[in-house]
C-alpha cells in the first residue's frame, strides 16, 4: 500500500510527473545539466503518450514505436537516441519504482565523431587577441585546466590552491571531485584578475555577484574567435578537447589524461588518441627528405 501511495500517479499530468522526476533526481545528487537533459527527453516522451490515462498503462510496444519513428525518420542522432531511452528508463524507475527493459532500443553501433579542437597556434591567437583581463582569465582557465563550462562557473576562490599549484574541481560530471595542476602563467593572470575585480565567492562572478552566466562565457569565446580570425567553429567544450589533444600530442600518458579530464572510463579518453593517429598519418616519411 505504501508503494501505491508513493509511486502511483492517478492521471497523466505531465507537469506533476516532471516536477516529481526532478525532485527525485535531485535527491540522487544528479548534476544540474543531467537533470535538465533528463527532463527535456521525458517531456518529449510524455507529449507523445498523453492519450494514456497514466504512465502505468503505456504499453512497451508504444514506447518502442515512439523511438522507432524517431530513428526511421532520421530525426535523431545516436547520442540523442541513447539519451531518450535512458531518460524514459530512469523516469519509470523513479516515478513508478519500476525497471523496464528497453536495452534493445539502444543503438548497438556507435558513430562517434572525432571531437573538434583548436590548434596550438589558434589557442595562442585567441589568448593574444583577448585584451579584456577577465575574459582572458576565463578563456585561459578553460584551456589550461580542460574544464567543462559548468566546472568553470562553479569554481570558487577557495578552490584555487596557489601554494600547492593545484585547482580543486568539485562535483564535476559523475559527482566526483578531481584535481588539476595550476600553471604558473594561469596563476599570474588570475592574480592580476583578482586584484582588478575582487570576486567574493565564485572565481568568476557577474556584475551583481553570484555565478557568471553560461551565455556570457559563450559570447566571450565567440568574440574571441572572430578577433583571432579563427575560421573553424568552436564552443567552450572545444577548449577542453584542445587541452586533452595537446596533452596527448605532447606525450602525456593516456591514463594521466583520463584522470585530469575526470573520465570514468578510459575508452572515453581514447577518442583523443584517434586524433593524434591522424596527425601521425600526416608525418612525412624520411624518404621525402632524400
Predicted feature descriptions by range:
Residues 1-290:
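Conserved catalytic core of the tyrosine transesterase superfamily
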Amino acid at each position: 500500500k505504501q508503494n501505491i501511495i508513493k509511486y502511483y500517479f492517478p492521471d497523466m499530468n505531465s507537469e506533476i510527473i516532471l516536477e516529481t522526476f526532478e525532485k527525485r533526481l535531485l535527491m540522487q545528487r544528479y548534476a544540474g545539466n543531467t537533470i535538465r537533459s533528463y527532463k527535456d527527453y521525458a517531456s518529449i516522451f510524455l507529449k507523445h503518450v498523453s492519450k494514456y490515462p497514466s504512465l502505468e498503462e503505456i504499453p512497451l510496444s508504444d514506447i518502442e514505436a515512439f523511438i522507432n519513428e524517431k530513428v526511421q525518420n532520421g530525426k535523431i542522432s545516436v547520442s540523442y537516441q541513447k539519451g531518450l531511452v535512458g531518460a524514459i528508463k530512469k523516469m519509470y524507475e523513479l516515478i513508478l519504482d519500476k525497471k523496464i527493459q528497453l536495452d534493445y532500443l539502444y543503438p548497438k553501433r556507435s558513430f562517434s565523431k572525432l571531437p573538434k579542437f583548436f590548434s596550438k597556434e589558434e589557442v595562442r591567437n585567441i589568448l593574444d587577441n583577448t585584451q579584456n583581463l577577465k575574459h582572458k582569465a576565463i578563456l585561459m582557465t578553460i584551456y589550461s585546466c580542460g574544464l567543462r563550462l559548468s566546472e568553470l562557473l562553479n569554481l570558487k576562490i577557495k578552490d584555487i590552491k596557489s601554494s600547492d599549484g593545484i585547482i580543486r574541481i568539485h562535483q564535476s560530471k559523475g559527482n566526483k571531485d578531481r584535481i588539476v595542476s595550476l600553471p604558473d602563467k594561469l596563476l599570474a593572470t588570475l592574480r592580476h584578475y583578482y586584484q582588478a575585480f575582487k570576486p567574493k565567492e565564485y572565481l568568476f562572478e557577474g556584475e551583481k555577484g553570484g555565478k557568471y552566466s553560461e551565455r556570457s562565457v559563450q559570447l566571450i569565446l565567440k568574440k574571441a574567435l572572430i578577433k583571432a580570425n579563427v575560421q573553424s567553429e568552436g564552443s567552450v567544450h572545444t577548449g577542453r578537447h584542445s587541452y586533452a589533444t595537446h596533452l596527448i600530442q605532447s606525450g602525456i600518458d593516456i591514463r594521466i589524461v583520463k584522470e585530469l579530464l575526470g573520465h570514468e572510463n578510459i575508452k572515453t579518453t581514447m577518442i583523443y588518441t584517434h586524433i593524434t593517429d591522424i596527425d601521425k598519418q600526416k608525418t612525412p616519411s624520411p624518404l621525402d627528405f632524400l
